[in-house]
């Protein structure tokens, strides 16, 4: 069992903040990929699918036992805590004003990922320090939550490696 304080500790945490993710496979993929990318934890809104769902557990391929996670009742309180701890928050948002790879993720970072159908709530997105978007070609409007998370986490890992 972890709590919010466990997840945000450390000098340069890399955190995934998930709002109302519904697909167990997506949640499991985010946790598994997150471990590979070096995240320090996952914070989930109460509206997110149960992490102990059998499909989620299978999709994590064991990462559920190694990546700290917690559920949060009040996402605005989470955002206030992240800001207080000087963790930069980046909302993955279709209307983001900045391209994801134009930011610096070498410092304490939290990525906000929203629900598969609706994305982040406007309230949560607007409470982030930055609203970022992943540029896309063709007529694709958005990416799967697990894929978008992977792109952001590995961009942070790439920057931190160099």
Task: Label each residue range with its predicted role.
Residues 1-3, 118, 158:
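Active-site/binding-pocket entry motifs
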Residues 1-96:
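RNA substrate-binding interface of SAM-dependent RNA methyltransferases
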Residues 23, 74, 104, 141-144:
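Poly-acidic low-complexity segments
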Residues 36-37, 51, 56-64, 122-162:
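Structured adenosyl-cofactor binding patch, chiefly the S-adenosyl-L-methionine
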Residues 90-140:
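Active-site/ligand-binding-proximal alpha/beta "capping" segment
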């Amino acid at each position: 069992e972890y709590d919010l304080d466990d997840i945000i500790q450390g000098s340069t945490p890399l955190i995934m903040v998930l709002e109302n993710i519904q697909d167990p496979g997506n949640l499991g993929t985010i946790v598994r990929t997150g471990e590979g990318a070096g995240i320090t934890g996952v914070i989930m809104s109460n509206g997110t699918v149960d992490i102990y769902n059998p499909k989620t557990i299978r999709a994590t391929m064991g990462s559920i036992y190694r990546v700290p996670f917690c559920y949060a009742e009040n996402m605005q309180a989470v955002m206030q805590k992240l800001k207080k701890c000087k963790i930069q928050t980046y909302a993955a948002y279709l209307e983001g004003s900045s391209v994801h790879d134009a930011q610096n993720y070498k410092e304490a970072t939290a990525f906000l990922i929203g629900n598969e159908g609706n994305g982040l709530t406007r309230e949560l997105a607007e409470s982030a320090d930055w609203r970022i978007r992943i540029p896309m070609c063709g007529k694709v409007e958005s990416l799967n939550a697990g894929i978008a998370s992977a792109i952001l986490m590995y961009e942070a890992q790439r920057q931190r490696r160099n």
